[in-house]
Amino acid sequence: MRYLQVKTTNLYDESGKVSRMVGSIEDVTDMENDMLKLQKEARTDLLTGAMNRAAGTSAINRMLVQELHPGCVNTFAIVDLDNFKTLNDVMGHMWGDRALCEVVLIMKKHCRAQDIVCRLGGDEFVVFLPDITREVAEESLRVLSAKLHIDYVKENLEVMISASMGIVFSDGRDITFQELYEEADGCLYQVKRTFKGSYHISDRAGREKAD
């Protein structure tokens, strides 16, 4: 796609009326592409290609005020990798970076086009599934959890990483990213304390359950 910039100037006669117009057309494709690239980089985690924290927070807050279809909820999940520090320590940071990129690729391929995958920092991510039924959301995240059990082997070394998730279902519009994060973080704490590699769900409508 080419971007063209059109500039016009009015020329006036002695009475002050417009007598004619002259203009120029300039190809600004390179400048426009550079601007689009900078805008994308401002929203993107450069290592993994996921949304960065600022962009993810903003996008999720915008979605939270939108009307939901009957029977649907917004689903907010913190995804925290298990044994990631061990992978870094045993195999080196290049393997850790590789794991982060592979995890994001798996999450992006698994999620719907309207879903958000956001890297908060380190090995912590948010997956946001807007306007979805509880049953479909839980099944989707259960399958994703299974996909994120990844075995890394280097010579005689082997490290298995997995993903623990704290999940919140919300059906109201009077809530923010930060409030959902704090509640999901409490669910994540339960998982980390009991059985890593699984998930715990808090339903703001009043139900709680674990896998």
PLM regions: where:
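Conserved long alpha-helical elements within nucleotide-processing catalytic cores of c-di-GMP signaling
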Residues: Q39, R43, N52-T75, D82-R112, ...
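Catalytic core regions of nucleotide second-messenger enzymes
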Residues: R119, E139, L148-S164, K192, ...
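PAS-family sensory domains
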Residues: M1-R2, K17-D27, V159-I161
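PAS-associated C-terminal cap
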Residues: E26-L36
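Sensory-domain boundary capping and coupling elements
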Residues: V6-T8, I25
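Catalytic-core segments of nucleotide cyclases and related cyclic-nucleotide turnover enzymes
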Residues: E14, H93, E138, R142, ...
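PAS/PAC or PAS-like capping segment
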Residues: L11, V28-T29, L81-D82, I132
